[in-house]
């Protein structure tokens, strides 16, 4: 069981904190000789497989690493342009790792804003007054859990569908936010959370929840 991600969204719909705790990925790594027998193309500043599905590599997968070095968008971590590098026969043999494209910071901001809007729509559509809004969304691979405070801050956790005790974990995260963000004299309300103690205690809470499978009182 696992907790995949934690998001904190302010009352205006802005993403003020995000942590990827654990994200299972269907990744495939293979060593290639020249010429590369896959067709790669640039799309949305990512290098994607356009043709040549094989050995766990799928159309739409992105180039994640070359020779063990991470790829960020269209460039490797040391600044090499991916398509240019792979087009040079002198660089072969080459090991390439493929997988689902990772979300960019801008995409995470956009998704947080979209969820904020959906939450508001859900509250308005409720036949009963005082609706709590969206508390959980379920898919076949994860569950999204949301807890909104009285001040409008939303704490969102993406977790394995089998993970128990998320309601208690959400309230624990709120407690950590109150203790290590709100009480930090250098933190401004509604602004991105950059507090080391908040990071440390949040990661510890996630570890406890994952190991126990639940997060009960006294944790």
From Swiss-Prot:
Q: Which domain of life is it from?
A: Eukaryota
Which keywords does this Swiss-Prot/TrEMBL entry list? Answer: Cell membrane, Endoplasmic reticulum, ER-Golgi transport, Golgi apparatus, Membrane, Postsynaptic cell membrane, Synapse, Transport
Q: Which SMART domains match?
A: Sybindin (SM01399)
Compartments, record wording = Postsynaptic cell membrane; Golgi apparatus membrane; Endoplasmic reticulum; Vesicle
Q: Name one Pfam family in it.
A: Sybindin
Q: Cross-referenced SUPFAM superfamilies, in alphabetical order?
A: SNARE-like
Provide one Gene Ontology biological process annotation.
vesicle tethering
Q: Which InterPro entries match?
A: Longin-like_dom_sf, TRAPPC
GO CC: one term? cytosol
The family this protein is said to belong to: Belongs to the TRAPP small subunits family. TRAPPC4 subfamily.
Subunit structure of this chain's protein: Component of the multisubunit TRAPP (transport protein particle) complex, which includes at least TRAPPC2, TRAPPC2L, TRAPPC3, TRAPPC3L, TRAPPC4, TRAPPC5, TRAPPC8, TRAPPC9, TRAPPC10, TRAPPC11 and TRAPPC12. Interacts with SDC2.
**Which disease does its entry mention?**
Neurodevelopmental disorder with epilepsy, spasticity, and brain atrophy: An autosomal recessive disorder characterized by severely impaired global development apparent soon after birth, early-onset seizures, lack of psychomotor development, spastic quadriparesis, progressive cortical and cerebellar atrophy, and dysmorphic features, including microcephaly. Death in childhood may occur.
Q: What does this protein do?
A: Core component of the TRAPP complexes which has a function of guanine nucleotide exchange factor activity for Rab1 GTPase. Plays a role in vesicular transport from endoplasmic reticulum to Golgi and autophagy. May play a role in dendrite postsynaptic membrane trafficking.
Give the protein's recorded name.
Trafficking protein particle complex subunit 4
Q: Which organism is it from?
A: Homo sapiens
């Amino acid at each position: 069981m696992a907790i995949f991600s934690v998001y904190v969204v302010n009352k205006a719909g802005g993403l003020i904190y995000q942590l990827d705790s654990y994200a299972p990925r269907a990744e495939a790594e293979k060593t290639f000789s020249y010429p590369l027998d896959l067709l790669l193309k640039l799309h949305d500043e990512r290098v994607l497989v356009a043709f040549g599905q094989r050995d766990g590599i799928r159309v739409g997968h992105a180039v994640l690493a070359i020779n063990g070095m991470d790829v960020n968008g269209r460039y490797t971590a040391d600044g090499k342009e991916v398509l240019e590098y792979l087009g040079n026969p002198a660089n072969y043999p080459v090991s390439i790792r493929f997988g689902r494209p990772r979300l960019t910071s801008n995409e995470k901001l956009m998704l947080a804003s979209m969820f904020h809007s959906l939450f508001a729509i859900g509250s308005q559509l409720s036949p009963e007054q005082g609706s709590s809004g969206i508390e959980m969304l379920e898919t076949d691979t994860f569950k999204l859990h949301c807890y909104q405070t009285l001040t409008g801050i939303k704490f969102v956790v993406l977790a394995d569908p089998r993970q128990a005790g998320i309601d208690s974990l959400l309230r624990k995260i709120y407690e950590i936010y109150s203790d290590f963000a709100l009480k930090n004299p250098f933190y401004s309300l509604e602004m991105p959370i950059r507090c080391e103690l908040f990071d440390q205690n949040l990661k510890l809470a996630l570890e406890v929840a994952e190991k126990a499978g639940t997060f009960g009182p006294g944790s």
